[in-house]
Each structure stands twice: as C-alpha cells, then as structure tokens.
C-alpha cells in the first residue's frame, strides 16, 4: 500500500465541477492499493500517516505530526501509484489491486484515519481534479 503525502495549507478535490472534499492545513494523501495489500497493511500505513512528523514545531524543526499540528486529511484514491514503470514508455498496472479490493481497503483506510482526525475524501474510481497549496513544498512517498 502506497501513500504519497503532501503537507498543504489547503487542498480540495472536485468531481464534475463540484467540490466534494476540502481541507485547510493538513495532509493531502494520495492512496494507491496493490494486489497484495490487506487490512494489516492499511493499519500500518494509517498509523504512519497519522504520526509522521513533518510539521514544524516552535523551533521551525519538522517535529510534529498532523494530529499535533491540529491538521486535517484529504484522502484521494490514486491507482496510478501502483504502476510499474520499469519497462518501456507505458506504465503497467498489473501490480494494482482489483477495484473491489482497492475500494474496500480505501474505505477501511479512511475509517481508521477518521478515528483520529477530521477527514475529507475524493470519490473512488472517479475522474477527479485535485488542487492544493503544497506547504514547503513537503512531499513524502510512504510504502508499507
């Protein structure tokens, strides 16, 4: 399971011109689910996202997690994160989870995160437009 996380001052996701998810300060989490993923991996990734210390403390050092920074999460499914780009000039999505499993684990990941923080979401398998203001910029690739 893969999360591309970006520290943001604001982010939103639109579907068909309508904003369906929006946050202020927090993390934009682009979530990719792979074939071998399960709830145990989702638990580990949620724990990592919620506790990853990438927000500045009073000394301007990355020492606070999103919970300590009183931030929010915007979680958006993105199957392209599971792409295999090693060969050729076209990505292969053979490592990606089938849609039913990917949706189940996406919803489960959201549920686990929502137990700790305010969460907004995208729409699974929809064509979405995501806009954000990356604070830093600060972006990390988390893989469990």
UniProtKB/Swiss-Prot annotation:
Any one GO molecular function term: Gly-tRNA(Ala) deacylase activity
Residue positions of motif Gly-cisPro motif, important for rejection of L-amino acids: 136-137
Location in the cell: Cytoplasm
CDD domains: Dtyr_deacylase (cd00563)
UniProt-listed SUPFAM superfamilies: DTD-like (SSF69500)
InterPro entries on file: Daa-tRNA_deacyls_DTD (IPR003732), DTD-like_sf (IPR023509)
EC number: 3.1.1.96
Principal location class: cytoplasm
GO cellular component, one term: cytoplasm
GO biological process: D-amino acid catabolic process
Reactions catalysed, as given in the entry: glycyl-tRNA(Ala) + H2O = tRNA(Ala) + glycine + H(+); a D-aminoacyl-tRNA + H2O = a tRNA + a D-alpha-amino acid + H(+)
Keywords per UniProt: Cytoplasm, Hydrolase, RNA-binding, tRNA-binding
Enzyme class: hydrolase
Domain notes: A Gly-cisPro motif from one monomer fits into the active site of the other monomer to allow specific chiral rejection of L-amino acids.
Quaternary state and interactors: Homodimer.
Family: Belongs to the DTD family.
Biological function: An aminoacyl-tRNA editing enzyme that deacylates mischarged D-aminoacyl-tRNAs. Also deacylates mischarged glycyl-tRNA(Ala), protecting cells against glycine mischarging by AlaRS. Acts via tRNA-based rather than protein-based catalysis; rejects L-amino acids rather than detecting D-amino acids in the active site. By recycling D-aminoacyl-tRNA to D-amino acids and free tRNA molecules, this enzyme counteracts the toxicity associated with the formation of D-aminoacyl-tRNA entities in vivo and helps enforce protein L-homochirality.
Protein name listed in UniProt: D-aminoacyl-tRNA deacylase
Primary gene name: dtd
